[in-house]
């Protein structure tokens, strides 16, 4: 439900939608919510959304593919899937976008991120490294096996590696 405003929104819902899309890609649901929040009438928002889709400026499929491509550099597929669901992208579209990410690319992203998260910290044991860096990778949506592989790469061959 749109919030009450003291004055009507400036410009058309279509123009406002174009400005939003010019800043970054949005899902259809996000555009709809933002336009309603800015006080545009429901009918104008629906017409603007339909026109943006018709002109090719708005579409959940394109949004999902771009979103996955951008976020997969720093997040695992589990987190990205949850984010797409929160943006109301349908499951089939989200799964198609997520399927395009190569497993090797996820492993490389986790390795790069693990190096960045560890920084210059010297860990006393592999378990400590796994506890601190591995846990952060898990929170970012990487699977356990990928987080462990990234941590093992950081640790590289010390005797405690066998403990894990």
Predicted regions mapped to residue ranges:
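An alpha-helical, amphipathic repeat domain used for nucleic-acid recognition
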Residues: 1-164
């Amino acid at each position: 439900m749109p919030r009450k405003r003291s004055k009507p929104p400036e410009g058309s819902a279509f123009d406002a939608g174009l400005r939003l899309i010019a800043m970054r890609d949005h899902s259809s649901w996000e555009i709809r919510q933002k336009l309603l929040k800015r006080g545009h009438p429901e009918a104008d928002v629906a017409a603007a959304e339909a026109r943006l889709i018709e002109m090719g400026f708005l579409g959940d499929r394109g949004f999902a593919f771009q979103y996955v491509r951008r976020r997969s550099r720093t997040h695992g597929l589990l987190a990205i899937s949850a984010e797409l669901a929160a943006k109301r992208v349908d499951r089939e579209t989200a799964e198609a976008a997520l399927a395009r990410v190569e497993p090797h690319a996820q492993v490389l992203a986790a390795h790069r991120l693990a190096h960045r998260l560890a920084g210059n910290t010297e860990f006393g044991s592999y378990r400590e490294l796994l506890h601190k860096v591995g846990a952060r990778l898990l929170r970012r949506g990487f699977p356990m096996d990928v987080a462990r592989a990234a941590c093992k790469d950081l640790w590289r061959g010390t005797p405690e590696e066998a403990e894990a």
